């Protein structure tokens, strides 16, 4: 079963439950991609979209005969697009195409009438890219408590203290960057102070199963169809494989339940409604996105040593080769540039110092982050990188010491 997990697993037992009412559902079969051709799976299936109690949107496909859910993908706004494949002779083949990366899922309509096909397509895109606000569907679970409960030290500290480094990074990603500059607006001690006083994050394991990411502009296209007839099933369609791109990882962590019914969606809602203020003292902010342009990064990324250090951070997968080209595509994508600009603005707010402590950054970098000095932060990180001995140097030194001990 192909399952894409959330980056932030719920910390509240039972909060991953879902409402029994689907946002959209229609009968449709799967199609398998083999090489550049898609062929229909004759099983009876059901495509449905549901919003779970943690406010996440799931795109699912299940076998109507066995009841087995084979695909359960967590989709975020602007991750993907559901559209008809015009090259298919039957006109009833649709593809869930992810905007960042090469992943595509094909389906063929099994509803007896065709008059609702386009309406189903419209509803799918509406639910995936404009999901309903939490609580508007009347689902039980997270809507029962108020956001103000997050202001208490016990709730927030329990929530944040049990996050892994990768999970904390989500807070400075596009989904949660809206309000890092206004952290002081939280009631109680504030998120920044809680980050500084919270314990080390729990251990976590991650995998790259989430289908979409802030990665690279896709270049995929669908070519003309070629027929391979099947009874009551669409003809197979030929598709040109796009250049693969990274997909963001999803993390799972093992953590104790907080003392209050705290949901991460509440925290993200607070962060998303805050505004990043101007730099301290009215000083001019440094926009990292305008500094780290593709032209400037090109000669750096051409360095084999740099490529070797960056390759391990690319997501792994069957259709996601870890190549130097993928590094180039990722770092020059509009999504990455947008995330870089948002991180730059949040860093300039002077509120990220405690968060930087969580990552074990040098004191100079933490101090610069507390001051909102982006330039000083960059210099501190550069100096720290220069001071760290290279792996080869460390090995040579160790060998030399062993030789001396033998003498």
Swiss-Prot record:
Specify the domain of life of the species encoding this protein: Eukaryota
What do the Gene Ontology cellular component annotations say? cytoplasm; nucleus; proteasome complex; proteasome regulatory particle, lid subcomplex
Question: Which residues get modified to Phosphoserine?
Answer: 15, 140, 211, 405
Assign the protein's first listed, main location to one coarse class. Answer: cytoplasm
Phosphothreonine modified-residue sites: 217
What keywords are annotated for this sequence in UniProt?
Answer: Acetylation, Cytoplasm, Isopeptide bond, Nucleus, Phosphoprotein, Proteasome, Ubl conjugation
Recorded GO terms, molecular function?
endopeptidase activator activity; molecular function inhibitor activity; protease binding; proteasome binding
Compositional bias ranges of the Low complexity kind: 137-150, 196-248
Segments forming domain Pru: 18-131
N-acetylthreonine modification sites are 2
Boundaries of every DEUBAD domain copy:
277-391
Q: Where is this region: Interaction with UCHL5?
A: 362-407
| Comment, domains | The Pru (pleckstrin-like receptor for ubiquitin) domain mediates interactions with PSMD1 and ubiquitin. Preferential binding to the proximal subunit of 'Lys-48'-linked diubiquitin allows UCHL5 access to the distal subunit.
Concerning its family, UniProt says: Belongs to the ADRM1 family.
What this protein is called in its record is Proteasomal ubiquitin receptor ADRM1
Species in which this protein is naturally found? Rattus norvegicus
